[in-house]
Amino acid sequence: MMTPENDEEQTSVFSATVYGDKIQGKNKRKRVIGLCIRISMVISLLSMITMSAFLIVRLNQCMSANKAAITDSAVAVAAASSTHRKVVSSTTQYDHKESCNGLYYQGSCYILHSDYKSFEDAKANCAAESSTLPNKSDVLTTWLIDYVEDTWGSDGNPITKTTSDYQDSDVSQEVRKYFCT
């Protein structure tokens, strides 16, 4: 064995031996911590991939359900919309179902008559059905304006999104489609 010649060499040899043991312990801890970090990263990646696949499947289910709901509602609105009204009297209660073969908006049914008629004929036809021509002010700021545009209004002028000079002219000879409400 090596014998140090002075105290300084003796301390340095001794401390190097202790330091070597500490390095081996630190290396083991670093390896264990590094392994734990790698394992946790792999688990995180796997869970993220699994969640992404799950969310993609759910998104496809929601989109197909939404597409079916939009299609069903469009068919229902186009075919007929109906409302349920309860009529309550003092003795009995009745369920009254009112159907609308047209556009339903805020309790009113807008039925399109695609035959072209003059204002007077359209007004008389709506009166025979116990209804009236729509007011421009009622439909101008709603989604209905896209449907009732260029049809007869209750004031005798065509319903349009914009006002122009021709609306004040004589429209007695014109024929248009019309809605009854």
Curated annotation (Swiss-Prot):
Virion surface-facing ranges: 58-181
Keywords: Disulfide bond, Glycoprotein, Host membrane, Membrane, Signal-anchor, Transmembrane, Transmembrane helix, Virion
Intravirion side: 1-34
Gene3D superfamilies named among the record's database cross-references: Mannose-Binding Protein A, subunit A
Subcellular location: Virion membrane; Host membrane
Protein's membrane topology: Single-pass type II membrane protein
Glycosylation (residues): N135
TM helices/strands, residue ranges: 35-57
GO cellular component, one term: virion membrane
Chief location bin: virion
Entry annotated with the keyword Membrane: yes
Protein role: Forms a complex with OPG162 and OPG190 to coordinate the incorporation of OPG164 into wrapped enveloped virion (EV) membranes and, subsequently, the production of actin tails. Therefore plays an essential role in efficient cell-to-cell spread of viral particles.
Subunit details: Homodimer, disulfide-linked. Interacts with protein OPG190. Interacts (via C-terminus) with protein OPG164. Interacts with OPG162.
Family: Belongs to the orthopoxvirus OPG161 family.
Protein name stated in the entry: Protein OPG161
Source organism (scientific name): Monkeypox virus
Upper classification of the organism: Viruses, Varidnaviria, Bamfordvirae, Nucleocytoviricota, Pokkesviricetes
